[in-house]
Amino acid sequence: MNKKDLKPASVFYYFEEICQVPRPSKREEKIIAYLKAFGRKHGLETKTDEVGNVLIKKPATPGKENLKTVILQSHIDMVCEKNSDVEHDFLIDPIDTVVDGEWLKAKGTTLGADNGIGVATELAILAATDIEHGPLECLFTVDEETGLTGAFALKPGFMTGDILINLDSEDEGELFIGCAGGANTTAEFTYQPCLLYTSPSPRDTERS
């Protein structure tokens, strides 16, 4: 199997495209530019907010105009790690993907499928002409990996949808309806040196 055999073909086409675009957390300017150009190319309303979140709207297909607006959401940054023997600059170098058996992998670096596969899914839906749907809003948020900056910065009115589906999940065919969330805790402790007590050995006891 090679990359052209991966299904859904349109999703993996766009995943390969965004693998050519550097997108480290807090340095997403190139992928933001890519998304804006994508929106213009397909004649879709596209806007960004002050932190870089991108929203691309797609009108409903004929007969579906009265359905509720659905928001599809994914984050555009990725975890950037590489093997110690690999030379790779995540600010300028593309991700080199390869099919290994049934897996799509990256050569010596993280792949960026979290959440690149979600981004690619949204792009495939936006570009599709054979999918019936109601009004769609595709939301691409920044800096999820190091602080959820994009999500926390969203303001009322940026989206208008009634339903939001987050595509940052790891289980195909399963839908999560809730989660416990996460939290960061910063703790400070003051330490003072102390002498550790050690019990005497049997030999020391005999000597005494």
What are these regions (language model features)?
Residues V21, S25, K105-D114, E174-F176:
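Flexible, glycine/proline-enriched loop segments at strand-loop-helix junctions
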Residues K64-F140, E144-E145, A151-D162:
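Active-site metal-coordination/substrate-binding segment of hydrolases
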Residues F140-V142, L167-S169, F189-Y191:
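Short, structured patches in soluble enzyme cores that scaffold and shape functional sites
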Residues P156-L175:
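A glycine-rich helix N-cap at a beta->alpha junction
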Residues F176-T185, F189, C194:
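TRNA-recognition modules of translation machinery and tRNA-sensing kinases, especially anticodon-binding
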Residues Y197-D204:
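Conserved small/polar residues in nucleotide/adenosyl-binding loops
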